[in-house]
Design a protein with these regions (language model features):
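Helix-rich cap/lid subdomain of alpha/beta-hydrolase
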Residues: 88-140
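Hydrophobic, aromatic-rich cap/lid helix
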Residues: 136-161
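Gly/Ala-rich beta-loop-alpha elbow adjacent to hydrolase catalytic centers
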Residues: 59-68
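Glycine-rich His-Gly loop
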Residues: 7-11, 61-62, 84
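A conserved short beta-strand
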Residues: 75-88
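Aromatic pocket-lining residues of Rossmann-like dinucleotide-binding sites
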Residues: 25, 71-72
Length: 161
């Protein structure tokens, strides 16, 4: 039985966050494929399923599962969600602070502050630990112009969830 893992990072990350998983997968004879949004200097890529894989496992972090195409999901046999969600902005009054924070983040992106926004975001999500404890991401290599646009588009997707 052949197993393929297909991993998708979340908002503001990149595929390098899955590097520690690779040797563990290989030890088990599993193939690990990593999707990449291309926020930084790594080009976007969307791997597909190996036609010989009998087990097709999606591993998605945070927004990651929402970034994968429907046809990929239709062929998956298992899903693993890491700190993910079905909905991001709660309905009604409870969702107002979250929606306001997302609008403020979008304004920073529109003003050209993608790197500063990601630094602040990483500080928040890493807390109470320092952001240096997070896996490497696009900040280390620099945010590309196209990457900043993708960050904005994916941030807008969060508003719809």
């Amino acid at each position: 039985m052949t197993t393929q893992l297909l991993a998708q990072h979340g908002w503001g990350g990149d595929q390098r966050s899955w590097a520690p998983w690779r040797p563990l997968a290989e030890q088990r004879g599993w193939r690990l494929s990593c999707a990449e949004r291309g926020y930084g200097q790594l080009p976007p890529q969307q791997p597909g399923w190996d036609p010989h894989a009998s087990r097709r496992v999606v591993i998605g972090h945070s927004l990651g599962p929402h970034l994968l195409p429907a046809e990929l999901w239709q062929q998956a046999t298992t899903a693993v969600f890491l700190a993910s969600f079905a909905a991001f902005v709660p309905p009604g009054r409870e969702g107002r602070p979250v929606a306001a924070a997302l609008r403020a983040m979008a304004a920073r992106l529109a003003a050209g502050d993608a790197s500063g926004l990601l630094r602040d975001f990483h500080t928040q999500v890493a807390a109470p630990f320092p952001p240096e404890r997070l896996p490497p991401g696009p900040l280390e290599q620099g945010i590309s112009e196209a990457g900043a646009q993708r960050l904005g588009a994916d941030l807008a997707l969060l508003c719809l969830l």
